[in-house]
């Protein structure tokens, strides 16, 4: 019999560990007992899903394969330790390996009564819905005065105690045999037909049609139009496929899309119930065979790319265009990374196009203030460009009626926008050669994407939050998905390969040259990819709060519970991989917050996200508090200084400029109470708890500034629309971690450099995993330009130098 024994504490010295080790030896002829430690289990946080991390999956797999479970708990403040509680939370959040699993509770404590109260509480927890373990009644083993209970060999001293433990354990063996009979597969019968159900997805309702025959689920059709394109797409293919393949509801949620995953599973369960069957029967069946694949695999490629976001797919496309074979290895079930979550357009100066648009009020003032900067504050390598820009701007200001732009303006704004001081007063700015490549080749990247198949809107030029200038190229399709869908199609149709569910654990090095990767598959199997070169494109570490806190030198505090707009996949893996072969790091102390994030989830796709020229930010008192056209870090700090929570106020015309939304989504959010709407500004103020007169006065003043083209309060850099056409809207916002500027040190060819400034042979990096470009603050819209410019360069250089 196979049993798993869990040490219910992360303490280095524990009598509960000693008890389980004794049981492992003492009952070795009766059962194979595997002891699992909870030392590395993260504290439970439902906004930071760790279900698919190796430590949680180790418990999931071991418990699923075991005949029974033993949990040994100490007693802390009359209950179980928080670390044990966190483990159980993780094992009942998106996975449920304890459901129906025969479980024995034991415990050891200094107290004479052992861990009796903790064991009672643990029993209640294990009986709870979602956990639903089958706990052995009675016969609980409580080891009191544990500090006197063991001899020098770790054996229990008292024979009567051993005898009682024997009786409890032998009863548990019988209990396991009987209880597991309840878990044997049952036959199921449906009333044939197609059943329509509506369940909850991440963004709202998910209508579904489930077709069943007499004994099978035959088809699952989901209307996913309400979900964000690209983010949850894998849910709508994988989960129905595994349900049908295994005729089971024992299907794991997809990492990064747990809400939608559980929505699909709940919807099918409802349909099963409508068809006259018990969904619990399907929940207790084993997983689909494809979900249990453990076969090791080995691949050969010319270039292997770590990360399936924009930078990784751009690198793969460049490798294919050079006539070579790439393999992309992606950590998560779905590709796209942070790119698919991008909420804004892509920066690139295109003066011929931009010049066909009229200038906005305030833009000429922005340029005048820029060229008035004291030259003594400009770093030497940028001074020649700054002086040349002054000449360009002075010529433009003779007729400032149209929208101006140039490569020099883009370069200087990227430089100044990233120039920051840390908490100790140390200054950082973007590496000149990297900034030059970005700004010179940005439009080339737009044209390259167009050639591959991305369509851009030509009827408007826009600007994401904190971009400082209108030079945004907005795709026709939803923002990030527009890039990922086209690049994925290009890579697959031209002979590239993409491996998902495969976090890379190690770089393979041969005689000092990086020659491939070792990854771990969905079920722990080894995946080897041998290649002539490796490109790291795995993103930053915005979803790794501990790593943010470790390196932070810019923000006064990064709270433990801070939200992020990032995919949960970006936890710094590529940076650690680079360090493992000697890579140097740069700018790690600087991270960026997105000021206009959802206050609960950190996401960017809720509410009305409009161009900054139409931002009207008010604090909880109904007053403006910042130049809304400013950089992201300044907007975020201003929001934090005003309590964190603020509101974006909009009217019906401003609503029409919003990204990534529809009237249907807006109506659903108003109904859900996450977006506010009213026929008057005063009524809107009442809904969000403000003084109606204060908010009305704020909007009246703002409208007068738009008319005048000048903001005497905060000197807003650009205006577009007034707020005066009903209905009016308020979108609650709060800063969340959005981007990490630091990373692996690279050169303009994307070689990864070691601490001596030397090239690490065979290793390249592009995108957020690399540092040195954005310095202390990234301009909005520059991340997309970064990943597609340097992603292409990485693929091209890797082929040129190694293949």
Swiss-Prot record:
Q: How is the cofactor bound?
A: Binds 1 FAD per subunit. Binds 2 FMN per subunit, one is bound covalently and the other non-covalently.
The domain of life is Bacteria
Any one Gene Ontology MF annotation carried by this entry is: steroid dehydrogenase activity, acting on the CH-CH group of donors
Q: Which residues form a coiled coil?
A: none
Cofactor(s) essential for the protein: FAD; FMN
- The PTM FMN phosphoryl serine maps to 258
- What family is it from? Belongs to the FAD-dependent oxidoreductase 2 family. FRD/SDH subfamily.
What does this protein's UniProt record list under function?
Catalyzes the two-electron reduction of urocanate to dihydrourocanate (also named imidazole propionate or deamino-histidine). Dihydrourocanate is present at higher concentrations in subjects with type 2 diabetes, and directly impairs glucose tolerance and insulin signaling at the level of insulin receptor substrate (IRS) through activation of p38 gamma (MAPK12)-p62-mTORC1. Therefore, the UrdA enzyme from the gut bacteria S.parasanguinis strain ATCC 15912 may contribute to the pathogenesis of type 2 diabetes by producing the microbial metabolite dihydrourocanate.
Question: What name appears for this protein in its UniProt entry?
Answer: Urocanate reductase
- Write the gene name: urdA
